[in-house]
Amino acid sequence: MKIVVLGGMGMQGKAALVDLVNIDPVDDIICADADLKGWKQLEGFLDTSRIRPVQVDGSSPKAIASLLAQDVDVAIDLLPLPFMVNAFEAALEVGVPLVSTNYGKPIRRLHQAAAAAGVALMPECGLDPGIDLIICGHAVRQFDRLELIDSYCGGLPERKACDNPINYKISWNWDGVLRSQKRDSVFIENGRRLEVPAADQHTSQMIHQIEFPGLGALEAIPNGDAEFYTELLGVSATVRQAGRYSLRWPGWCAFWQPLKALGFLSDTPLTGLPCPVSPHQFLAELMPPYLRYRDDEKDIVAMLNRFEGLIDGRKKSIRTYLLIERDLQTGLFAMSAGVGFTAAIAARMIARKLITATGVLNPALDVPYEAFMSELSRRGIMVKEEVVVEGT
């Protein structure tokens, strides 16, 4: 089996490499990235004998296609978001299946061409989106009528690492974190579509707190299009409530709302400066040095999914909980493991024909639940499920 990891030197890319080397080792792995300066560090904690580092320009679809054309069985795209479309178009051009962890909206237009070519393109297959969607796809089949589907997920520092004004440290792409603070969201509330524009993301009526076992109160912030997934899962006719939320320690919205109102997240370059810089670019460069984890600090991933409905005429509820902590021995972040391991599992499933559908796929429909959960547990990642049925 030959697998290419695009963006292999990034945080999630390293996690995917760890998985491909240590769990059911893959014979031939290509770590492709624009910058390979960290390769020596990788050799310090990972057996790299089956990994070949290759420099590739993610901004060039031609360069990506040339790499994937080298008898590759499947590729994993963990490049920065602006290069996502390049990776998918290159994979389709050369007929190589590809797994990505980004939202799939930009490449859904490729479905017919990919299906006709017999190529599997799997976006949204990381942590969130990813594990949450696989859980949702399984859960909806446990009801005769589904009425509520809420999904919560967030990466945050353990309590002892909360030593800055926003109680947050970087375990993900910081530019991506900033962009997620200006994302439109769509909910189902009382059976009706409710739009939360990005401008209202941190003041919306949908903001609330949840209690997460072992962590306590967490702030839930609007994050994503819940309506799309109710339609994808075929439950939009019965669902009365649906939402997708990010989780943070309380106080997150109180910090970001005034900054957003004052233009600090704007992408418009400022005039009168020595060079054109947008407020977003300024924050992207300014804040990371203040938000770094120390070697002895853990990041945490917390995920909660809630489902309510009817089975055999009785009320039924399902709650699933997932908690991942950083591995201090390897230094691998919980966020990286949740994203990179999931992508690596799905890539193997495609290469081994456990996933045979083609076109633009989705984890909620196309990743086999039991097999996937078995693979997660092999990696020490456990999903706890609580089921309550009225009258039992």
Task: Please provide the spans of the model-predicted regions.
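ADP-ribose/adenylate-binding Rossmann-like module
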Residues: A90-I107
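Helix N-cap at the beta1-alpha1 junction of Rossmann-like dinucleotide-binding domains, i.e.
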Residues: G10, A34-G38, K105
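Conserved Rossmann-fold cofactor-binding substructure of NAD(P)-dependent oxidoreductases
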Residues: G58-Q70
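N-terminal Rossmann NAD(P)H-binding glycine-rich loop of SDR-like oxidoreductase domains
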Residues: L6-M9, K14-D19
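C-terminal catalytic/substrate-binding lobe primarily of soluble NAD(P)-dependent oxidoreductases
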Residues: Q142-T392
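N-terminal Rossmann-like NAD(P) cofactor-binding module of classical short-chain dehydrogenase/reductase
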Residues: D73-L78, L98-S100
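Rossmann-fold cofactor-recognition segment
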Residues: L46-S60
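Rossmann-fold NAD(P)-binding glycine/threonine-rich loop
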Residues: N102-P123
